[in-house]
Amino acid sequence: MEEHSLIKGLKDGDNEDFRYIYEKYKEKLNSYVYYKIKNKSEAEDLVQEIFTKVYKNIGLYDETQSTFYNFLLSNANQIIAEYSRKNISREQKVE
């Protein structure tokens, strides 16, 4: 299925299109997140958060500005940064 039509379906609220996109990108995104944070279970949780955020914010995606994968990575980087800030804060409280 062509990505353009999947994105349109996703913007229209089609859960099947979302599922297809999720299956298409989840492993690649999981590898990216794991590379950044070096924790497998946390990476899996963050990937879920990323896809939730993408689902909620799909209306902000503009195909003329970037690829969908770059949109995913942009959301991933925001979630990873938030995760890192929380981790640093937790580590400082423990010390």
PLM regions and their residue ranges:
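Structural recognition of an alpha-helix C-terminal capping motif at a helix-to-coil junction
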Residues: S31, D45-T52, S66-Q78
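N-terminal module of bacterial RNA polymerase sigma factors
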Residues: M1-E27
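Sigma70-family region 2
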Residues: K11-D12, F51-Q65, N87
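Arg/Lys-rich amphipathic alpha helix in sigma70-family domain 2
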Residues: L60-E63, S74-V94
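Short, charged helix-capping/linker segments at alpha-helix termini
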Residues: K11-R19, N30-E49
